[in-house]
Structure formats: C-alpha cells, structure tokens
Amino acid sequence: MATTPVQPPVSNSPPVTSPPPPLNNATSPATPPPVTSPLPPSAPPPNRAPPPPPPVTTSPPPVANGAPPPPLPKPPESSSPPPQPVIPSPPPSTSPPPQPVIPSPPPSASPPPALVPPLPSSPPPPASVPPPRPSPSPPILVRSPPPSVRPIQSPPPPPSDRPTQSPPPPSPPSPPSERPTQSPPSPPSERPTQSPPPPSPPSPPSDRPSQSPPPPPEDTKPQPPRRSPNSPPPTFSSPPRSPPEILVPGSNNPSQNNPTLRPPLDAPNSTNNSGIGTGAVVGISVAVALVVFTLFGIFVWCLRKREKRLSAVSGGDVTPSPMSSTARSDSAFFRMQSSAPVGASKRSGSYQSQSGGLGNSKALFSYEELVKATNGFSQENLLGEGGFGCVYKGILPDGRVVAVKQLKIGGGQGDREFKAEVETLSRIHHRHLVSIVGHCISGDRRLLIYDYVSNNDLYFHLHGEKSVLDWATRVKIAAGAARGLAYLHEDCHPRIIHRDIKSSNILLEDNFDARVSDFGLARLALDCNTHITTRVIGTFGYMAPEYASSGKLTEKSDVFSFGVVLLELITGRKPVDTSQPLGDESLVEWARPLISHAIETEEFDSLADPKLGGNYVESEMFRMIEAAGACVRHLATKRPRMGQIVRAFESLAAEDLTNGMRLGESEVFNSAQQSAEIRLFRRMAFGSQNYSTDFFSHSSYNSRDANV
C-alpha cells in the first residue's frame, strides 16, 4: 500500500507544550536505520544559554517512512505566523532542503520557557503498526560560549520525508572552523525509524564551537518560514551583533545541496578599520605638513626680524666736517652718523668687530681696533677730559670719524651689567640727544664710541674766543636742549636723570641745533662705584642745593642745572668765575637779585650779555629770564618740570603765527566759490559739489560769526 508522505511544517516559534497528534496508520517499505549525529542525546539545558557568534544548525531528526505526521497545532505566539502544511508528493521527487537558521521570537511572547523549538513530530512506528503513544520529543540544545552581548537562537531545520529505500545520503562537510562544531543528535524514539534522515546542513565557521542554538534573544523577532516543496527556504541572517556566516542551500537535490557561505558580518568592520587607518594616515600627513610649514614660517619671520633690527640703526647720511677741540670740554664732539649699523664679535678676551648686517657695521669693537683708530690714544687726538674720562678723536678703517670716550669707572662692574646698561642707552634716539653707537670691553677697560660732532659745544661758543652767538641762536639752543631733557624725563622708557647738565655737555650741530650728550654716564659710574660714598656727581656751579645737603639727585636737580645753563645764555658768564669779586663767583647767587629786579621793572641791561650790544628781543629776554628764575629756585618742589619749560619756549614762536595781524581785524576769505583751483580741489576731495559747497559755506559763516 502506497503512502503519501506529508512533510511536517517548520516552526520557528518556541517549544510547543502540547504533544503532536498520532500519526496515520500508513505503512512504508522498510528502510535502513537513520543516520544520526555523533553526539548522544542530552537533557534539555537551562532556559538561557550564552549566544554563540554564528548561528548553529542542528541535524534534523529522523522521520517515519510513509507515515507523515499531521501538521502541528498552531503555536501560541502571536508574533510568529503558523506554519503551513506541505502537500504530500511522491517520495522520489520530494527532497525538502534543511531549514536555515531562523531567529526565534523573544521569550516574552511565548508562555513556555525559551528553548530551542522541539522537533515537529516524534519518530513514527514501523509500517503497519499503529503509531505509538504521542509524546513530545525533548528538544536538544547544545551550549556554546557567546562572543556577543545578546543571545541568538537558531531553530533546527525541519524534517524531511524521504520514503525511498536508498541509503542515507552523506552529510556535506562543514566549513573549517577553529573547533569542531557539534550538531545535536536526533531525539530518542521508542522504535527505530526506517527512513533515512535528510543531510544535516553544515554549520558555518566560527571562532568558537557552536554546540546548540541558545535561547532566543531579547530584541529578535521571528520571521515566518517560506516553505516550498521544490525550492529551498530563504536564508535568514542572524542578529547584527553576531558575526556568523549564514548558509544558503544550493538546490533541492541532497547530493548536490552544497551550502553557499555568505561573507561574515564582520567584513564591514574590517573595511571600516581599513578606512579608519587610511584616514589616520592622511591626518598624520596633513599634520606633519602643517608643522613643517609652521617651522618654515617661523624661520622666515626670524630672518626678517633680524634684518629689521639691523636696519633700524641706519638713519640719515651726514658727512662729518673738521672740528676744533678744547681741553676744557668734558665731552666728545661727536654726532650720530647712522649710515652704517653695527655688529659684534669677540676675540682673545676683547670684543672684536664682526662683519655682518649692512655695510660691515658693528656695535662691539675690539680694543686693538680703537687703539689703531685713535693712533694709540695720542695727545694730538685728545678732544677733552672730564670727570668720566678722556675723549679722543678716531677714524675707523671704513673712514668714519668717531669720538672714543675712555671711562674712568674701572672694572668694578661686571661685563654683563655694563653691556646691558649700554644697550639700554643705545636704544634712546632723539634729534636733540647724542646716542651711543658702540662700546668696547677689554679686561678692566670700558670705552664708549660716539659719532663725531663737528661744531663743538655750547661752552666753547659762549666762553671761547670765537665770534659771539647772536640772540636768536641762543634761544634756539635753549629750546633744543630743553626738548632733549624733557624727552629723557617724561617720554623715555625707562626715564633717565642726566645728573650732569652743563654747557659742555650740550653739543652743537653746524646749524646750531643742540644735542645733549653724556646722559646715563653718571648712572654707570654710580653702578660701578657703589662702595664709594664720597664721590661727587656733577659739576660745581651746576649742582642743586639739595644735592649738597642730602646727596640725592632727582629730575628737579636736572631742572636746576638747566636753569644755570639759561643764565649762561642770558649773561654770558661762567657758572663759577673766580675772576669776579668775592661773593660773586657763583653765577646763581649773583643773578638772583637781578632776576627779581628785571621781572618787576622789565629792565634787562643788568643781566643781558654785554657782547650782545642790546641786540635782543625784550619779550623773549623777559620769557628767558622768567624761566631761568623758576628753574634755580631753592625748593625743588617749586621748580617747574622740563615739559613746562619746553611749552614756555614754544610760546615764543607762537607769537609769529598771527603774522602781525590781530584777532577781529581780518575776515576769512571764502575761496570755495571764487577760486577755480579750490573748486577743483573740492571736487577731487569730496566728489560732491553741493556737499563741499555747504561745508565751506558753513565754515565761512562760522568764522564770520566768531570774528564778530
């Protein structure tokens, strides 16, 4: 009697608690015993098992020949659709492929514990024997250590009906894996089955051995199997968290049903890792390029800064002219000639010139060079001698004329301190100041180098045998010296107190512009002789009275000394004249009562220099006497600042701004409407004729109103 085998439906739902119904009393020819997996049946494991990295496939259980069981009842889960029964077909043509790994629904949706779904049917009895009592076959689970966080469950493939009497087909080999993958054995049956089981699908390669499908994951939802008698079921991929390879059956022929391996899920990860590596390499390359460009920019910036520093010393081109000298002068007769900056070098204990920068310039000179330039510091080259040392005229190898000052400060001060102080002073530049352009340190010797000034100093022109200075020149010299001192006191950083203002330290240009020299030398002497408390800084006749009582020099001390210089310009007398009668040797003490009388009566003949012959401007003489009287006051707090003295001299020149016209006697000429040149300028400057016309008209009306 022929039987029509019916393939049981595949269930991807959790285990069914109710036993399957009894099988039909159909008989089938005897078949060899089923081929089972090597593992013996094992008891059901606990509900939860750690998920393996790949989905695990199990060998299907044997089914009865010719006695297909009826379809199982509908699973209780609502999330999984019920399996559809397979229409029976002739045994030779029916070869259902093994079912791929299918995730099962979460345990929350199934009332029984989350286990691998049991086999759809229990093993049927032999032919012509009533089916045994229905009993649910226990599910077979094989545990496997999970590599991922969430568990993955893969149900076993459905049983297939093979009523043929041929021996069972061989099972296709499994892909290679690090450890053998064990398939769960078929469930035990009371009676042996007589139909060969279908080939068990191979398990995918995995890093760890997969022994059984674990309990269902929490977030995985089951998908309904698509069963077809002649086509293999679709392959479902495991959850994204696991990295297994998924088997895809090739055809419905068991002998040619070689599984197709999909690439593992961690392939994208390797691609991402490769992409990340490439990005990191690109980022590192860009960073290295930026660092190289930054270093190159810093190098170029340093070179440009060095060039600017060297070129900052250069100035106007002034050709020195021959000069006459006197031993009475305490300063060199030099001037700034900045056509060539200076560089430096050191050799054999002394600083040697170093060609560099522009025009082989140098700021540090060797002692041998200065000896050669001054002809061995001969008396023929001596320009003057004062409290700080002797001044010699010298000619450098490049033809420049310089003044070399030998300081009498000894070697008490360290080289670093002296060099730092000189560098600070050499940075001071003003049109009414003489700056230091070089220095030399050789053992205990200290030398300063200035450019040569050709027109001597104020002391020489006032008290020498040359022609008499006219009044206008004297006013010009006084105003220039006041500006230079005001710069040192108020605008220079750090502020500098000269400490030795006198007529011999006011050098004159060829056009009689005044330039104050030797500023800062008193401080150098004090720094080098701090242990000497009896040294007197300054010159008798110029020193302020508070210095004699306290020994303290302040800015007001310089103001007092400048007042003495003003008295020299007014009277033509020396600060201390021993040829005068007793009690009149001091210029300040002699001039005090005369200053008060001249301010009250505006009679200046008693104070004015007889050499002038009365050729002076009375208003300027009055202003000059007034300024001198304020500077030589006894109390330092009553003396004006140098800035106030400068403004007093500027007011002398401000009187010429009116050009002989008085306020209110003139009318502003409106040239905006009558001069063609002004109209052209207006169009070029403003672009709009109406706007510029209103502007000029408004200014003209305001000027007229102000005059009225």
Swiss-Prot record:
<dbReference type="InterPro" id="IPR001245">
    <property type="entry name" value="Ser-Thr/Tyr_kinase_cat_dom"/>
</dbReference>
<keyword id="KW-0723">Serine/threonine-protein kinase</keyword>
<feature type="compositionally biased region" description="Pro residues">
    <location>
        <begin position="1"/>
        <end position="23"/>
    </location>
</feature>
<feature type="domain" description="Protein kinase">
    <location>
        <begin position="377"/>
        <end position="652"/>
    </location>
</feature>
<keyword id="KW-0325">Glycoprotein</keyword>
<dbReference type="GO" id="GO:0019901">
    <property type="term" value="F:protein kinase binding"/>
</dbReference>
<feature type="compositionally biased region" description="Pro residues">
    <location>
        <begin position="30"/>
        <end position="243"/>
    </location>
</feature>
<feature type="active site" description="Proton acceptor">
    <location>
        <position position="500"/>
    </location>
</feature>
<feature type="binding site">
    <location>
        <begin position="383"/>
        <end position="391"/>
    </location>
    <ligand>
        <name>ATP</name>
    </ligand>
</feature>
<protein>
    <recommendedName>
        <fullName>Proline-rich receptor-like protein kinase PERK9</fullName>
        <ecNumber>2.7.11.1</ecNumber>
    </recommendedName>
</protein>
<keyword id="KW-1133">Transmembrane helix</keyword>
<comment type="function">
    <text>Could be involved in the negative regulation of root growth.</text>
</comment>
<dbReference type="InterPro" id="IPR047117">
    <property type="entry name" value="PERK1-13-like"/>
</dbReference>
<feature type="glycosylation site" description="N-linked (GlcNAc...) asparagine">
    <location>
        <position position="272"/>
    </location>
</feature>
<dbReference type="InterPro" id="IPR008271">
    <property type="entry name" value="Ser/Thr_kinase_AS"/>
</dbReference>
<dbReference type="GO" id="GO:0005886">
    <property type="term" value="C:plasma membrane"/>
</dbReference>
<keyword id="KW-0812">Transmembrane</keyword>
<feature type="transmembrane region" description="Helical">
    <location>
        <begin position="281"/>
        <end position="301"/>
    </location>
</feature>
<comment type="similarity">
    <text>Belongs to the protein kinase superfamily. Ser/Thr protein kinase family.</text>
</comment>
<dbReference type="GO" id="GO:0004674">
    <property type="term" value="F:protein serine/threonine kinase activity"/>
</dbReference>
<keyword id="KW-0418">Kinase</keyword>
<dbReference type="InterPro" id="IPR017441">
    <property type="entry name" value="Protein_kinase_ATP_BS"/>
</dbReference>
<feature type="compositionally biased region" description="Polar residues">
    <location>
        <begin position="250"/>
        <end position="260"/>
    </location>
</feature>
<keyword id="KW-0808">Transferase</keyword>
<feature type="topological domain" description="Extracellular">
    <location>
        <begin position="1"/>
        <end position="280"/>
    </location>
</feature>
<dbReference type="GO" id="GO:0106310">
    <property type="term" value="F:protein serine kinase activity"/>
</dbReference>
<feature type="region of interest" description="Disordered">
    <location>
        <begin position="1"/>
        <end position="272"/>
    </location>
</feature>
<comment type="subunit">
    <text>Interacts with KIPK1 and KIPK2 (via its cytosolic domain).</text>
</comment>
<keyword id="KW-0067">ATP-binding</keyword>
<dbReference type="GO" id="GO:0071456">
    <property type="term" value="P:cellular response to hypoxia"/>
</dbReference>
<feature type="binding site">
    <location>
        <position position="405"/>
    </location>
    <ligand>
        <name>ATP</name>
    </ligand>
</feature>
<keyword id="KW-0547">Nucleotide-binding</keyword>
<dbReference type="InterPro" id="IPR000719">
    <property type="entry name" value="Prot_kinase_dom"/>
</dbReference>
<feature type="glycosylation site" description="N-linked (GlcNAc...) asparagine">
    <location>
        <position position="269"/>
    </location>
</feature>
<keyword id="KW-1003">Cell membrane</keyword>
<dbReference type="InterPro" id="IPR011009">
    <property type="entry name" value="Kinase-like_dom_sf"/>
</dbReference>
<feature type="topological domain" description="Cytoplasmic">
    <location>
        <begin position="302"/>
        <end position="708"/>
    </location>
</feature>
<keyword id="KW-0472">Membrane</keyword>
<dbReference type="GO" id="GO:0005524">
    <property type="term" value="F:ATP binding"/>
</dbReference>
<dbReference type="Pfam" id="PF07714">
    <property type="entry name" value="PK_Tyr_Ser-Thr"/>
</dbReference>
<feature type="glycosylation site" description="N-linked (GlcNAc...) asparagine">
    <location>
        <position position="25"/>
    </location>
</feature>
